[in-house]
Amino acid sequence: MQTVELAMPDGGVLRLELRPDPSRPILFALGVRKSGSSLMNLILLDLAEANGCPVVLLPDVAFKAGYRYPDWNGHPELFKILRRGNLYAGFRDAPTGLFARPAFKTARKILLVRDPRDALVSEYFSSAFSHRMPERNAAGSLIEKRRGEALQQSVEEYVLAQAKQLNRTIDFYRPLLGDEELRIFKYEDVIFAKPAWIRDMADYFGWIAPDGLVDEIMAKRDLVPTEERPTEFVRKVAPGDHREKLSAQGIAKLNAMLSPTWRQLGYDLG
């Protein structure tokens, strides 16, 4: 076990526990908020444990310590966390601070994306109702602020207001889209085909996923509500929810606001 400490500007320390293995590769699991990243990370934790691969959840560790994405992503010594034999996961924003590093460039990476219109609708319900409030720190104060803002807006008002921020998130991933080491999964393709998705991710990372393991993971992770649950974390998984929650005019306006990167990923935005 190795401990890596990053001195933060506020005088604190971001501490990560790593288990390097020079004989195994570095792996990355990347995502976008409200696009199935929590489910992907849980599945990967199960797969990684079965395959003896340590998982480093950098964003989660940072969040619990009170640090947000800009705090760690821009850290000049972020590269020090990279060790062979680890899966780096938990990302809902692009770790651009690592993009130039050879260890990142050559690492196998998966990226899970979702129709941005559905992601924004999902984000509204999470912000307004289902996010568990964390400890009172800078990160927690931001979530509390977003909840207050969401509760004062309609779904449509919220998604139109937040579209620019989601564009920013996906545009930061754009430099990776031609990366030969990147495998892209679309939420719409995998949410109702989880066994195949589990096997695909395992195979890409060089892991095994026998039928018994896939069955165990499915028993734990295959949560599909029979009806919408607005205040629950797993609210509604079926694609196309934006068509039920937004007006035709709202969808047209949102389509016009969304980044070309979404079209590059294969989403038809009209």
Residue ranges, per PLM feature:
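The conserved 3'-phosphoadenosine-5'-phosphosulfate
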Residues: 54-72, 178-248, 252, 256
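Active-site cofactor/cluster-binding pocket
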Residues: 148
